[in-house]
Amino acid sequence: MDTAKMMNRYTSFPDADLLDFVNAPLGKGLPITKPLKPLIAIPTTAGTGSETTGTAIFDLVTAKAKTGVAHRALKPTLGLCDPLNTRSMPAAVHAASGLDVLCHSLESWTAIPFNERVPRPSNPILRPAYQGANPISDIFSLQALRSTIKYLPRAVKDPEDHEAQSQMLLAATLAGIGFGNAGVHLCHGMSYPISGQNPGYFHAGYNEADPLIPHGVSVAVTAPAVFKFTAPSNPERHLAAAECFGVDISSVKKESAGEVLGEALADFLVKLGDQPRGLRALGFRPEHINMLVEGTLPQRRVLNLAPGLAIGGGDVERIQVTKLFEDAMEY
């Protein structure tokens, strides 16, 4: 679906350079100034929610990281979400794509609020596709989180559990509406160089000839560390997320919100099965961290929505991102 969006954009602007519309600073970040061709998106996995969003992600090999184009004009004209199209997914693909849903919902739920987001250009055409957490996106993000926690383990465990498969496709779409409006932040920003700098990892259940870290895996592997870091910005939201995992938060102190949510996430990932327990399990070592940081810092489209991050690409932000990768080595 993302490839179709990119082709729609490039065929509508045949004289444009590859990087003209790609998110700055990796590209020029130019706005899309006219309607694109009609596009019907049909998901065959329960993960990206791309049928609902104005985002198209691709691997920019020269930068050793993923990036993309984000603009409302990229949103498909129509999305056809039929659970029958997901029935042939292997368990490993159910798991990896479902973890993308999990992080879409968690990141959009915890993103910087819409009224605190910067920059906020006065010209509407220059405004980013992602607006920050808001009352509308919250509805979709929280429901997608609850559904993923309930149905993803079932969909992975039993290929004949059609109810779970159907609910996961719905959750992916709901999360797409949520994060397509509010945005994602650190898990996704850090995942792009993780995927692009794969040291040789082959994921269980994927019959690939070349090393591959599935996108959902690259996103979820840092999640326990990420939400421990972001929790002080809004402990109440992080505790509400922990409650979705079944945690009794009635006596949890606000300052413990990150630890509680991080532990709930780690427990969920372990019980899901066949998930790498940190970057070390993917083959990364401490000597790789500097390059991972270099691949993360240009991801301004999402980092600008990260609560608690010293936004701006300076030394403090670099130290924070470095520490996050260090903390994500194992959980």
Q: What does each model-found stretch correspond to?
A:
Residues 71-73, 94, 140-143, 233, ...:
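A generic short alpha-helical patch detector that favors 3-5-residue windows
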Residues 114-264:
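Active-site segments that bind and position negatively charged phosphate/pyrophosphate groups
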Residues 1, 45-47, 284:
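Short glycine-rich anion-binding loops that position phosphate/pyrophosphate groups of nucleotides
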Residues 11-129, 233, 240:
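A glycine/threonine-rich phosphate-anchoring loop and its flanking beta-alpha core
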Residues 12, 16, 62-63, 74, ...:
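Generic secondary-structure signature for well-ordered alpha-helical cores
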Residues 1-14, 52-53, 194:
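Short Gly/Thr/Asp-enriched flexible loops that form oxyanion-binding sites at enzyme active sites
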Residues 7, 28, 288-289:
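N-terminal loops that bind phosphate or other acidic moieties
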Residues 240-331:
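C-terminal charged capping/lid subdomain of soluble metabolic enzymes
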